[in-house]
Amino acid sequence: MSGEPSAIGDAQLYALAETVGRELRAAGWRIVTAESCTAGWIVKALTDVPGSSRWVDSGYVTYSNTAKMRDLDVSARTLDEHGAVSEATVLEMANGALQATGVEAAVAVSGIAGPDGGTADKPVGTVWFGWAWPDRSVT
């Protein structure tokens, strides 16, 4: 690996969204997104797929900590202790979205997109993804 950032092209993103949709449809599940640094791009990619209304429930864009707490029930303590860009926060975001909607799957993302805002501990480009289902959650 070169260590250089990579980007996913539109065709690859669409193919990935189709695959996610196919798997969700096959399971009879619906998904909710809880996004910060992506500002709605995940749910946009998913809803670009025809028929996505059968498996996409909704998407939250919670850019601020206030929105994370208000809309997704992320605790102030988690944000104070770990920050918005952390494993703990994305797990709370995913679980909060799942609880708010009652669907079967949630994805959450929070990161430091740049060009500024990074620190030595969390440089620009740091991103956490979290997934939640009724019986478990992972990052």
Language-model regions: role of each:
Residues M1-T139:
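Short alpha-helical segments enriched in small residues
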